[in-house]
Amino acid sequence: QAARVPEPLTPPIDKSTCHRSQAHVGRERWTFPLLAGIFLGCLWITNTWGVPLATVTAGLILLARPRSSIRMTVVQGALILSPAAFVALPFQANYVPAYGAPAEELPAFLARLPVAGWFLRTVGIVVSERSSFGELLRTHGPLLVSGLVALVATFRASDHQPVRPAVLASAVGFALVAGLASATPALVVFGLPLAGLAWVLWRERTAAPERLAALAMLAAAWSAILAVEFFYLRDVFGDRMNTVFKVYFDAWVLQAIAVPPLLLHALANWKSWGKSMAIAVVGFSLLAAAPYTPLSVWKWTDGFAQLIGLDGLAYLRQAHPDEFRAITWLRESTRPDAVVLEASGCSYSMVGALPHNRVSMATGRATILGWEGHEYQWRRGSARDLATLQKRRELLLRFFQEPGMETVPSVLSTYGISYVFVGTLERTGLGPNCPFLRSPAAEALGTVLQQIGWAPVYQDGAVTIYAPVVRR
């Protein structure tokens, strides 16, 4: 009697389920680009510096998606850029970028070119200040090591061949020697892994979309870290400082999202000695970086010499209690839309633990001019705005140094001033390192204010706050 063939374990295929699955895939092809485009447009408004890396990330995810034809990729790319442009257009219509070099720095024929001129004014080339091998490891160590382990594990899984310990040790040794000897260690630390990652992406192009997306995000992060070793966005400082820390923030986030699932997926299929070794390497890198935070806190607090806490104005309460009480009074007793006139200061400057522009900073009340350097930095792309800043700077200088019956009433009425704050800085000046307000005339200013109908509404120590007298 013939043996009975067992029933298949696979359940019969439900056509409705197939239709729903196909519909889900179809919706996913359109929803991802549309949502990515909307977020990209919002990013252009909120953090323009992050747009290049976000665009590269979205593009790599599209290119890495399985079973996507060139035509489909182009269509999806257009679906990303179209809503991005639509969302950002109202903002861009009135936006004057603060980055980029003035056109006068380029030869006239280059500055007039529509695309090349803009690119040359916007992107600078790093000729020095490249990160050392140690700096790269200190900054990116744990995420880099975890990403490399995930890459090796994925490489091993995709090639279905064990990774020979001798080959792996030789590769690590070569990378260490080359990184220490190279003038641009990032080419070794991130360039070589990027080449391996590109190969894995090509080999894994039929893998699950989620895994391909994680690989694409990791590739985007490493590409960005490598790119800032050669290029930077030109700004008022003329170096890559702002570009580096803004790109690093985004690259850390991308790696933190991409590395864990890649690592877990690869290690789940790694049955040899390598799995234990990989876990040990990742664990060691995390433990090696763990002391950074407590050691930094210990250093910056001078061994917890005194209680600091989370109160950002505690130092002001201790060093200048009269200023602190006056600021507290303004914050509690004035309308949120009040305009307080104080001496304009220089960026990051202090006089005896008293920061410049401390009143507007600590109260949230508007003033007519903030830190001089930052005011210029934010508006350097507009000649009209720079002229406005220069006018305000000159008026403030005359207001506090040469107060007269013409200048003082004009400034108060033009800018809708609600209160005039005359404190320590308005009496003694802003210090030798700030060229603004060297010889204030606080007593003469008080006399003029009272002559035009203003009176002290608050007095404490070195602080006097003036406001217009309300006549009944």
Where are these regions (language model features)?
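Specific aromatic-rich, kink-prone transmembrane helix
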Residues: 1, 57-58, 63-64
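Membrane-interfacial, low-structure loops and terminal tails that flank and connect transmembrane helices
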Residues: 2-35, 70-71, 160-169, 204-211, ...
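Membrane-interface alpha helices of multi-pass inner-membrane proteins
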Residues: 33-46, 173-179
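Residue-level signature of the transmembrane alpha-helical core
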Residues: 34, 38, 55-59, 286
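Transmembrane-embedded, aromatic-rich helix segments that form part
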Residues: 50-60, 188-191
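Transmembrane helical bundles and short interhelical boundary loops of multi-pass, membrane-embedded
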Residues: 76, 80-357, 426-427
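Extracytoplasmic
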Residues: 284, 291-472
